[in-house]
């Protein structure tokens, strides 16, 4: 019997051996495994593809008033931008700008001295692989990328596959463009708008292989200069097959590259681009302003299958988009949209100086174009203005960094408020260790109040015991009890509240000395 006992103990020890358990986990029994009917590709991307904060500026507007800013001027702003909590610095095209049909202030016909639109790429200085000499040299740009990295910032470049009439491609490869009956190259049109300063590529040219290879070489060139993040201009106007091929080629050698699709188009097209490999996508967020609109839109984005392939990047404004809400809502509208973008989405961005300073002047009645837009002229921004939003932006980004719940697009739930001017939602980690409630007054003019109802049990909070709600924007702490609690938000003070819940307040029963 003693021998049998020793043998049994040895078998037990062997069965419980940690090393054996590790081997069994690594090499599981596959005798019952079946093959999926379709072969699926799994793509692994950097964390920044999921969680990022973007800041956009025009380098030429970073100099002294009346002078063209340079990469060196941008470099001097890096501590400030990084200090606000951003980790991506997005620059519009930095290439030479064409002179033919150059645009002037407010999209008028250009005059001598106008800097033109950065999206009219190409001149006698060069094309997509060249740097506008007014900004500096290629070495200056490389230095900017290096110094930005030291501040925790990735420099994102704009990829705009289009040319000015002066681009070297128009002379060297006229076959890459569409032509009019008179033989001239066809400029871009989006009726009733005409863009005489821009020639789009003809992706259906008989020389498409050479064209595609050259466009790929542009992306690779800038990767070689240290760029790992790209914002792609109007990808929905190019063939799907082109993007599937180009992204595949780029990712094969550089899987760390992140591509943001700037495609304001039909949802099916936006979703198709995401499935083809774009890391992030612009959204309709800018035009969803009421609580019901926001609820409906983000319920769509947060549910499978869309959430499995579409990563939203939320922008309350861009150089092209100054919404009516921002035009008429005053400073409180900018604050509300900032909080919404930064807490509804794991990735968001702002067109920086204009947003910080609450720039709300439209070019025309009913237009979303900025008056005196930076797209066509230099702007001198008073970055030190006392009414700027820098302090709030810094605080919101700090809250995002400290709370894992805000670093993913999963875990979003909306909650009733009994007031359709209040939007209430929680973001939580899968284990509910981090739960944040955000309540936003979407009415930028009037104080709103209501009762917010929460499913406390889902968050590990006993409904019969008080718990602490720490409001992170003001620092205030409230003692809440039960699932329904009162909130009141004055938009002129702060149009939003972000609560972090602390576990139930302890009572005498919770201490050892209670007998």
Question: Which residues fall in each region the model found?
Answer:
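Residues immediately flanking
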Residues: 159, 263, 318, 442, ...
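Aromatic-lined carbohydrate-binding surfaces of glycoside hydrolases
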Residues: 93-105, 159-176
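Conserved beta-strand->loop/alpha-helix structural units within folded catalytic cores of enzymes
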Residues: 78-92, 141-159, 222
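Carbohydrate-interacting/catalytic domains
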Residues: 1-87, 96, 148, 274-277, ...
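Active-site-adjacent substrate/metal-binding segments within catalytic domains
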Residues: 46, 50-135, 198-211
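Glycine-rich, phosphate-binding/catalytic loops in enzymes
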Residues: 98, 106-108, 172-173, 247-249, ...
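Alpha-amylase-like alpha-glycosidases and glucanotransferases acting on alpha-linked glucans and related
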Residues: 118-146, 150-153, 163-391, 395, ...
């Amino acid at each position: 019997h003693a021998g049998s006992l020793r043998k049994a103990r040895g078998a037990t020890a062997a069965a419980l051996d940690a090393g054996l358990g590790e081997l069994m986990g690594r090499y599981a029994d596959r005798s019952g495994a079946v093959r999926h009917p379709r072969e699926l590709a799994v793509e692994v991307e950097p964390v920044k593809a999921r969680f990022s904060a973007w800041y956009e500026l025009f380098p030429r507007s970073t100099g002294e008033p009346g002078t063209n800013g340079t990469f060196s001027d941008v470099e001097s702003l890096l501590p400030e931008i990084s200090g606000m909590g951003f980790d991506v610095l997005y620059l519009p095209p930095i290439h030479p700008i064409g002179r033919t049909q150059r645009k002037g202030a407010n999209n008028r016909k250009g005059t001598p001295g106008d800097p033109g639109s950065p999206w009219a790429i190409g001149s006698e200085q060069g094309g997509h692989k060249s740097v506008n000499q007014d900004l500096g040299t290629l070495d200056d740009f490389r230095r900017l990328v290096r110094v930005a990295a030291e501040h925790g910032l990735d420099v994102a470049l704009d990829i705009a596959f289009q040319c000015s009439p002066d681009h070297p491609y128009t002379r060297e490869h006229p076959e890459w463009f569409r032509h009019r009956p008179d033989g001239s190259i066809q400029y871009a049109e989006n009726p009733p708008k005409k863009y005489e300063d821009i020639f789009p590529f003809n992706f259906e040219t008989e020389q498409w292989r050479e064209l595609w290879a050259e466009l790929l070489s542009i992306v690779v060139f800038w990767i070689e200069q240290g760029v790992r993040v790209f914002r792609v201009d109007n990808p929905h106007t190019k063939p799907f097959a082109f993007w599937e091929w180009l992204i595949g080629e780029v990712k094969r050698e550089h899987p760390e590259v992140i591509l943001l699709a700037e495609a304001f188009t039909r949802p099916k097209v936006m979703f198709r681009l995401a499935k083809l490999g774009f890391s992030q996508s612009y959204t309709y967020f800018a035009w969803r302003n009421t609580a019901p609109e926001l609820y409906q839109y983000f319920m769509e984005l947060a549910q499978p299958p869309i959430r499995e392939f579409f990563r939203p990047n939320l922008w309350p404004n861009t150089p092209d988009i100054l919404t009516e809400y921002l035009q008429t809502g005053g400073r409180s509208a900018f604050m509300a949209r900032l909080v919404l973008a930064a807490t509804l989405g794991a990735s968001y961005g702002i067109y920086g100086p204009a947003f910080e300073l609450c720039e709300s002047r439209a070019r025309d009645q009913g237009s979303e174009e900025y008056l005196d837009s930076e797209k066509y002229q230099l702007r001198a921004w008073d970055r030190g203005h006392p009414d700027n939003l820098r302090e709030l932006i810094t605080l919101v980004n700090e809250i995002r960094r400290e709370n894992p719940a805000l670093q993913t697009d999963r875990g979003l739930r909306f909650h009733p408020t009994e007031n359709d001017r209040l939007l209430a939602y929680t973001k939580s980690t899968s284990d509910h260790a981090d739960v944040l409630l955000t309540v936003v007054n979407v009415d930028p003019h009037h104080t709103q109040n209501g009762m917010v109802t929460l499913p406390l049990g889902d968050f590990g909070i006993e409904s019969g015991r008080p718990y602490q709600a720490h409001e992170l924007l003001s620092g205030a702490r409230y003692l809440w009890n039960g699932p329904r609690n009162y909130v009141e938000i004055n938009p002129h003070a702060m149009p939003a509240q972000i609560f972090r819940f602390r576990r139930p307040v302890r009572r005498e029963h919770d201490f050892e000395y209670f007998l």
